[in-house]
UniProtKB/Swiss-Prot annotation:
Gene designation: rpsD
UniProt GO molecular function: rRNA binding; structural constituent of ribosome
Superkingdom of origin organism: Bacteria
Organism: Salmonella typhi
Function text: One of the primary rRNA binding proteins, it binds directly to 16S rRNA where it nucleates assembly of the body of the 30S subunit.
Keywords, in A-Z order: Ribonucleoprotein, Ribosomal protein, RNA-binding, rRNA-binding
InterPro entries in alphabetical order: Ribosomal_uS4, Ribosomal_uS4_bac-type, Ribosomal_uS4_CS, Ribosomal_uS4_N, S4_RNA-bd, S4_RNA-bd_sf
A biological process from GO: translation
Protein's recorded name: Small ribosomal subunit protein uS4
Domain S4 RNA-binding: start-end pairs: 96-156
């Protein structure tokens, strides 16, 4: 399955919530009719069955993190194998992706931009270049921008945007050095309440 390359706001309208696919700190519901379905007239969304609600939640989370269907299912299987709450394990695995950590640290304005930085070999983990977006960052790992990439205007612009966002408590970032430490895995209370991971567990448990 190919990665979606179409209009980002269209996806957010389809899911009925901001998927944080666009750069900036202003919520996109001020830019577009987030409550309406995509299309010229924004037809009213049909009432969904329980399965439909579960499927929409899975699609929403998958799109937030920019993960393809097969990858997402594999994350769920891994989360189910781990000790603890499967839904919380799933979110922790998604948050631990290198592209997401780069975004959370403020080096990329969006997860897509952070993924591009990783694939272009602009990111190091513990002093070594890693160009795999799905690489799982471990507690106490140091993530940094390569020296030759520090002058990129998009990195500087992303850091300026990050100053306006709430800083994740599980990360420690030195914007001047363009590096940060993944102190710990985020707890459920650290993450968005707009995500209902229980619906995803119910979907895959069938």
């Amino acid at each position: 399955m190919a990665r979606y390359l179409g209009p980002k706001l269209k996806l957010s309208r389809r899911e009925g919530t901001d998927l944080f696919l666009k750069s900036g700190v202003r919520a996109i519901d001020t830019k577009c009719k987030i409550g309406q379905a995509p299309g010229q007239h924004g037809a009213r969304k049909p009432r969904l069955s329980d399965y439909g609600v579960q499927l929409r939640e899975k699609q929403k989370v998958r799109r937030i993190y920019g993960v393809l269907e097969r990858q997402f299912r594999n994350y769920y299987k891994e989360a189910a194998r781990l000790k603890g709450n499967t839904g919380e394990n799933l979110l922790a695995l998604l948050e631990g992706r290198l592209d997401n950590v780069v975004y959370r640290m403020g080096f990329g304005a969006t997860r897509a931009e952070a993924r591009q930085l990783v694939s272009h070999k602009a990111i190091m983990v513990n002093g070594r270049v890693v160009n795999i977006a799905s690489y799982q960052v471990s507690p106490n790992d140091v993530v940094s921008i390569r020296e030759k990439a520090k002058k990129q205007s998009r990195v500087k612009a992303a850091l300026e945007l990050a100053e306006q966002r709430e800083k994740p408590t599980w990360l420690e970032v030195d914007a001047g050095k363009m590096e940060g430490t993944y102190k710990r895995k985020p707890e459920r209370s650290d993450l968005s309440a707009d995500i209902n991971e229980h619906l995803i567990v119910e979907l895959y448990s069938k």
